[in-house]
Swiss-Prot record:
Record-given protein name: Ribosomal RNA large subunit methyltransferase H
Coarse class of the protein's main subcellular location: cytoplasm
InterPro entries: Alpha/beta_knot_MTases, RlmH-like, tRNA_m1G_MTases_N
UniProt: S-adenosyl-L-methionine binding residues: L76, G108, F127, G128, R129, L130, T131, L132
Similarity comment: family membership: Belongs to the RNA methyltransferase RlmH family.
Originating organism: Listeria monocytogenes serovar 1/2a (strain ATCC BAA-679 / EGD-e)
Single Gene Ontology MF annotation: rRNA (pseudouridine-N3-)-methyltransferase activity
Subcellular compartments: Cytoplasm
Keywords: Cytoplasm, Methyltransferase, rRNA processing, S-adenosyl-L-methionine, Transferase
Catalysis performed (reactions): pseudouridine(1915) in 23S rRNA + S-adenosyl-L-methionine = N(3)-methylpseudouridine(1915) in 23S rRNA + S-adenosyl-L-homocysteine + H(+)
EC code(s) of this entry: 2.1.1.177
Pfam families, alphabetized: SPOUT_MTase
Top-level taxon: Bacteria
Amino acid sequence: MNIQIVTVGKLKEKYLVQGIAEYLKRLSAYAKVTIVEVPDEKAPEVLSDAEMKQVKDKEGARILAKIPDDAYVIALAIDGKMKSSEEFAADLDKLATYGKSKVTFVIGGSLGLSEAVLKRSNERISFGRLTLPHQLMRLVLVEQVYRAFRIVRGEPYHK
């Protein structure tokens, strides 16, 4: 399985870079996982609704340019479906079983995802109702993908 994670912004925090690198190393036994960063749109702290939409649209265009046409796209969104780790694992396994070998996860910037990206997505998932920094979400996602592969193969880790 080829898994791509498209995310907005450059990761600067060393502890997150190290954590993600560790999980990517572990994941290499199960899948090819790549992380693609697109530039975030510079914006002032306080934005009108129209300005927020404009920022999300610009970031969204950059995201969409990185998604392969044949990819199954999963957007991480606060309004997405919440799943247990076991459900997430089963769903990833089903994608592989039914020939969806290219899966792209999308993590938006601090303002979220554009409507165009959400429309391109095949599904939306949420890792809870908490708001997490999008940089931290990368680490959470790669850990959950790793956990999913361990669960599917019946390997110890997830308890």
